[in-house]
Amino acid sequence: MSGFDNLNSGFYQTSYSIDEQSQQSYDYGGSGGPYSKQYAGCDYSQQGRFVPPDMMQPQQTYTGQIYQPTQAYPPTTPQPFYGDSFEEEPPLLEELGINFDHIWQKTLTVLHPLRAADGSIMNETDLAGPVVFCLAFGATLLLAGKIQFGYVYGISAIGCLGMFCLLNLMSMTGVSFGCVASVLGYCLLPMILLSSFAVVFSLQGMVGILLTATIIGWCSFSASKIFISALAMDGQQLLVAYPCALLYGVFALISVF
């Protein structure tokens, strides 16, 4: 045993002593209760103290931005990307620029040569009526056995271009090509009546010549009246009516022969 004691005392020389453990005490019955335990020189009795509310710092809501205060923005009304509903969308004909009221007024202006023309309406670029009248004119020629659609469209394009250049030289305000095509197309309506007569009767006699001359004067007078009303060309109706008569005279020759 003396050898074992010597080995035990010489193994791992340290200052630790078993007798020192009895000196450490745990106070379970003191005034601090279970929260006043002292262990390894640390005092945990301070954790249960009461802190007054006025001494606590208020916490601010995190806004996602560093060192920037929270800004209050007024509520905004959401703006719709498209129309709120299909009921509030404009009709398809209005989006295409087709107004049947204006088409009817222009048609009545052509059918009544002595009626005053509304310059604001006639200055619009409306090609729905002229296209319909050109198709109707070609259809009546087809009923008479004359397939002249190419001549009708070609002469119409050349005539509109010539009148466009002439009116821009004569007027102070100028005119668009669409307006010229619209007016000349609407004034083609009496020529449809002439081609309709050619389906039933022959226009190569004296009666046909008089009727053809009347239709040419009707078309040219209506077109010149509309042009001087829309472009404020007072006193120049005869100068405008002459080239219009030449253009409608070509359509009359197609209808007669």
From Swiss-Prot:
Cytoplasmic side: 1-124, 168-173, 218-236
Keywords: Cytoplasmic vesicle, Endoplasmic reticulum, ER-Golgi transport, Golgi apparatus, Membrane, Protein transport, Transmembrane, Transmembrane helix, Transport
InterPro entries given in the database record: Yip1/4-like, Yip1_dom
Biological processes, Gene Ontology terms: endoplasmic reticulum to Golgi vesicle-mediated transport; Golgi organization; insulin processing; protein transport; regulation of ER to Golgi vesicle-mediated transport
Main location: Golgi
Highest taxon in the source lineage: Eukaryota
Topology Lumenal: residue spans: 146, 195-196
GO CC term (a single one): endoplasmic reticulum exit site
Region of interest: Interaction with Sec23: 75-106
Tissue expression notes: Ubiquitously expressed.
Cell location: Golgi apparatus, cis-Golgi network membrane; Cytoplasmic vesicle, COPII-coated vesicle; Endoplasmic reticulum membrane
Transmembrane intervals: 125-145, 147-167, 174-194, 197-217, 237-257
Membrane topology: Multi-pass membrane protein
PANTHER family linked to this entry: GOLGI MEMBRANE PROTEIN YIP1 (PTHR21236), PROTEIN YIPF5 (PTHR21236:SF6)
Stated role: Plays a role in transport between endoplasmic reticulum and Golgi. In pancreatic beta cells, required to transport proinsulin from endoplasmic reticulum into the Golgi.
Quaternary organization: Interacts with the COPII coat components Sec23 (SEC23A and/or SEC23B) and Sec24 (SEC24A and/or SEC24B). Interacts with YIF1A. May interact with RAB1A. Interacts with YIPF3 and YIPF4.
Family in the record: Belongs to the YIP1 family.
Protein name, entry field: Protein YIPF5
Organism: Mus musculus
Recorded name of the encoding gene: Yipf5
